[in-house]
């Protein structure tokens, strides 16, 4: 047990030899704004589901920094938009569930596959657990203390906040008993999209500055996040470059899930579809529907 969470050795969870070999597409789309990043993820999901594209592992980053909220959250109720403007942050509503994340100084991954693909088959928690194996396997090449934790409920009596990294999830990726990767998943029309944020460096409590909170609650949540979340630089003892982390995760997914990857890019169909979705992710009808 680490902290208040049970942990399992990743090597005991699932034998990758049980999965038939497969080849997926690997895409690094670099840096984009929040609306573009969410549009790309949704379009890849559509393209893979329609068999226009193969299952895809994608890496990306965000500029300007962006607060994303889960599908069921309310931007206006959870996020102080004036505080965001003062700091140069944007905001976007994700197609996936979960809670708010400030995307800054991070690597984001996304996995898209048909629901029948063995690596995402089963219910959401089963597939989340399986995909976490790839994250853990890759991050362990950077530091051996990264583990996959059993699901544990939040401490009794403490109200859950709007922040993703404050809320324990099933089989989360942790180091030193603190959450290292925050992931969320959605299933639609036979496809699965899971994406997640890995803070590479910096203060993991910065999100607190832009949430709608009374000042005493803001200070309390900041303390909780610093206790419950961690950035990769604190784990490894150095700032690991984006490309090095992406390479480690690619190898981890390959080893843990018996995958090979073919380096690719967005197809012409996907690029055109992203342009068509931009008005949705930048518009009030989607962003402020809750």
Specify the residue positions occupied by each region the protein language model found.
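Short polybasic linear motifs
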Residues: 5-7
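Active-site loop/lid in soluble adenylation, ligation, and acyl-transfer enzymes
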Residues: 10-78, 82, 86, 90-94, ...
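Short connector loops at helix/strand junctions that flank enzyme active sites
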Residues: 62-64, 86, 102-106, 168, ...
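Extended cationic-aromatic binding surfaces that line active-site or macromolecule-binding grooves
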Residues: 62-75, 107-108, 112-115, 130-137
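Gly/Ser/Thr-rich beta-alpha loop segments that engage phosphate groups in nucleotides
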Residues: 72, 99-100, 184
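A glycine-rich, hydrophobic loop/mini-helix early in the fold
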Residues: 78-120
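Catalytic beta-strand/loop module used to bind and position nucleotide/cofactor moieties
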Residues: 115, 119-255, 284, 290
